[in-house]
Regions:
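C-terminal catalytic "cap/lid" subdomain
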Residues: 1-146
Length: 146
């Protein structure tokens, strides 16, 4: 979300699988069921900003990217923690985990836990630090590569 992450990187295309993971992990771009239905029907989705216009991104059947393609946050109910999740083919990775955790610790943000699965890693931080943590993880794992 460019409103939260000032140097967000626009992707021309993103795979259904990566967008589905981002939606499930908190991205408020598309609902996860809409992505699953589009994938089942082979229907590409064009996502654009309603404020800025522009080319946007296409969610479609494409080779899944081998890099980190997105970072999102999820604040659940009454929990005092928020999950900052990075998604992409480069994950999970001990190297990427160290890079992200180091960036967060340098900013004096405590990482309470790290969870990983196929194509994602989540970093659990205090809810009040979520937006700053999202920016830091984005900068460490995506912007540094651009």
């Amino acid at each position: 979300d460019p409103r939260i992450c000032k140097n967000a990187v626009r992707r021309e295309e993103i795979s259904y699988g990566d967008m589905l993971l981002l939606a499930q992990k908190g991205a408020q771009v598309l609902h996860d069921r809409s992505v699953a239905l589009a994938q089942a029907g082979g229907v590409p989705i064009t996502v654009r900003s309603c404020r800025e216009g522009g080319a946007g991104s296409i969610v479609c059947k494409t080779d899944e990217d081998a890099s980190v393609v997105g970072v999102t946050q999820k604040k659940s109910g009454r929990s005092r923690l928020a999950a900052i999740t990075a998604v992409g083919g480069a994950l999970p990775s001990i190297e990427k985990e160290k890079i992200a955790v180091t960036a967060l610790e340098r900013a004096e943000i405590t990482v309470f836990a790290v969870a990983a699965g196929e194509r994602f890693m989540s970093f659990y931080v205090v809810r009040d630090d979520a937006e700053r943590a999202l920016q830091l993880v984005h900068d460490a794992l995506i912007a540094a590569k651009e």
